[in-house]
Amino acid sequence: MIKICTVYFEDDWSSYTPDYVGKLYRSLLKNSTIPFEFICISDTDVEADIVLPYNHYSDIKKHWHKLKYFSPHFANQKPGDEIIIMDIDQVITGNIDDLIGYPVLDNQFISYGTWWPRKIKVNGGFYKFKSGQFDYIWNDFALNPAYWQSHYYENGDVHYRYYGEQNYVNWKLYEKGVKVIETPKEWLGKYTDNKKDMVEMNKMYSKISNTDYMILDDVNEKIKVVHFNGVNNTIHKYKENFIEKYWG
């Protein structure tokens, strides 16, 4: 069984709404022929196959709850299950059978292939692995969540407190000598409201994909997912045609 796992929470820091979960869920269903179970840790009602409680009173903050899915004892995981962890700030723009069905063997870790400059290998928007095979990511974090949740901010690796979850995952994989396998880079698009950045990103994407553009009025046909990562880079603030066409 493929389990696609997400997190949603409401607080003063987050500007997402519950329909982000539902839109991602419906888009995945519409654009895949592969059966999966969609799970969300949430503090409010959301559209999913299974909704698990988000605890605001625990030591675990914000999106760090994603790490719970690395435990084989969480979300009714069974041996052999393929676990996918996704962020909800993504728009599915085409068939994703190749993405969610991306082959994963024992002790392999799959993440988005990215084409822009980054200091780490993993991309927190998409992880795929077999249930329980990286349980130390959760186990080690659970020993001292307060330390890890502040470490990357205090170290200057991220610019906002409680960011750095993907940095932690990247470090634990590096520590254990795990090679991160990237999905094809041309499958992933990126969007921001900074027009200058979008021009440069279109150039970078065109170079790696041997095409003329990433996103203009529509997205390039090679793209399967557009990620709106970044603080306050919410999908619902945009009026672009491709968002109206594909989002939910």
Language-model-detected regions and their locations in the chain:
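GT-A fold catalytic core of metal-dependent nucleotide-sugar glycosyltransferases
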Residues: 46, 53, 64-122, 128-132
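N-terminal anchoring/stem segment of glycosyltransferases
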Residues: 1-62, 74-79, 131, 230, ...
